């Protein structure tokens, strides 16, 4: 007896210890599942956002809700059971027997839907489920574009931070050189102080780039639904597109005068929001047919057993509402108006798609030419000019103003080039999203 009590106590202690351990480890497990990797590629960022972003979670829940509506719409009405007792003289002094002194009825009734109501109702719900699924795909398309834009914004801020830091380090090297030249009497103290004052502008560039980088990372982490928005994050991808992204066809199409009709036709066939609008048209048309079917009333068939004061019998009945006053005119009018509204929304969506594709094509074409022009005309020349002026300044041939102008010009050229690369790549992703290209990899 004592042994069994002791074993029972040990068992409950183990259960309690396991429960406490699970409660302590659960927050860590949840945090581990929602954590974002320290090193993140663009492909990983898009995958994490599609999985964890609250908007995507809500869209998937909407699909589940639409599936529930479909299941409910496909079900038949439940039968009804009625038990009636009538006529028993409960308040008389000489009461007869209970079973033979009343009218007792047990009856089953089943409502029969007419005019194909259940089929039409199920078709409406199936269209709603398809619209919810396509809506989730469209939400994934938009979130994917937002993540790509936020990721590249952080990469741009990171590149600008590198340019600002490099320029500051170059200024510091020149200041160190001028201190040595001042000690040797080659320059005046005013020139050194002028350079030290000018250094503040480059320091301000570094601080501004730091802030832009932190804000860009926080924006990206928010899209990834990270538990904290100040997490350290190393971005692996750069500003230039890689061949694995599948953007070459879009780049060629943006440069081809005949590429716009092909991309527009693809967008009108593949974009989820266009497909949603078309599915809503089908749903509205089916809903109109359903409302017209509701003009025909349902029939309820009933039958059962009746004991009428000791006599057994069978009861049978048919119930049908008489549509004298209400023939569902309001429901039909509303459904017809919603059908016209669905047609108008489909036309509006197609117009938006045409505008999105054309604007994305314009941006991709302009940004491609912009990058090529900067690479051909300015990038190499700005670096060579800066190097020549820097060497001339070190030799005492060029003055301080020439050096500062060349340094600023090189810094501005680098930042302009980084911005052009950013705009080009983002415009290609915008074109892919406008066309509805699911095969384009991040």
List the predicted regions and their residue ranges.
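A glycine-/polar-enriched beta->alpha junction
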Residues: 47-57, 64-79, 106-124, 134-141, ...
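Bacterial Sec-pathway N-terminal export signals of envelope proteins
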Residues: 31-88, 102, 107-112, 120, ...
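Bacterial N-terminal signal peptides
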Residues: 12-27
């Amino acid at each position: 007896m004592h042994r069994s009590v002791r074993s029972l106590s040990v068992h409950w202690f183990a259960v309690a210890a396991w429960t406490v351990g699970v409660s302590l480890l659960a927050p860590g497990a949840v945090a581990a599942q929602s954590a974002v990797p320290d090193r993140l590629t663009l492909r990983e960022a898009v995958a994490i956002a599609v999985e964890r972003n609250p908007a995507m979670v809500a869209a998937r829940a909407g699909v589940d809700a639409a599936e529930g509506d479909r299941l409910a719409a496909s079900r038949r009405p439940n039968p009804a059971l009625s038990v009636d007792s009538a006529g028993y003289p409960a308040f008389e002094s000489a009461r007869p027997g209970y079973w033979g002194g009343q009218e007792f009825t047990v009856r089953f009734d089943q409502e029969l839907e007419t005019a194909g109501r259940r089929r039409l109702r199920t078709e409406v719900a199936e269209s709603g489920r398809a619209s919810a699924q396509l809506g989730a795909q469209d939400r994934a398309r938009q979130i994917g574009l937002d993540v790509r834009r936020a990721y590249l914004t952080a990469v741009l801020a990171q590149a600008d931070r590198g340019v600002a830091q490099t320029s500051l380090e170059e200024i510091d090297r020149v200041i160190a050189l001028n201190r040595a030249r001042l000690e040797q009497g080659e320059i005046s103290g005013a020139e050194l102080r002028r350079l030290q004052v000018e250094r503040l502008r480059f320091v301000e560039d570094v601080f501004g780039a730091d802030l832009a980088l932190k804000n860009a990372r926080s924006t990206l982490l928010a899209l990834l639904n990270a538990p904290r928005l100040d997490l350290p994050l190393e971005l692996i991808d750069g500003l230039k597109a890689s061949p694995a992204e599948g953007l070459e066809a879009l780049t060629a199409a943006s440069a081809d005068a005949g590429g716009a009709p092909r991309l527009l036709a693809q967008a009108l066939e593949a974009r989820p929001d266009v497909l949603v609008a078309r599915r809503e048209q089908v749903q509205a048309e089916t809903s109109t047919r359903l409302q017209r079917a509701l003009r025909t009333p349902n029939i309820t068939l009933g039958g059962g057993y009746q004991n009428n004061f000791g006599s057994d019998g069978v009861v049978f009945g048919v119930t049908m509402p008489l549509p004298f006053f209400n023939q569902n005119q309001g429901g039909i009018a509303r459904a017809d108006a919603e059908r016209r509204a669905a047609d108008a929304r489909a036309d509006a969506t197609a117009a938006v798609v045409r505008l999105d594709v054309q604007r994305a094509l314009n941006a991709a074409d302009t940004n491609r030419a912009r990058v090529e022009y900067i690479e051909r005309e300015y990038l190499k020349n700005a670096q060579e000019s800066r190097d020549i002026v820097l060497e001339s300044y070190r030799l005492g041939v060029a003055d301080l103003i020439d050096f500062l102008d060349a340094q600023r010009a090189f810094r501005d050229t680098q930042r302009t080039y980084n911005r052009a690369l950013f705009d080009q790549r983002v415009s290609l992703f915008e074109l892919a999203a406008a066309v509805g290209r699911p095969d384009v990899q991040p």
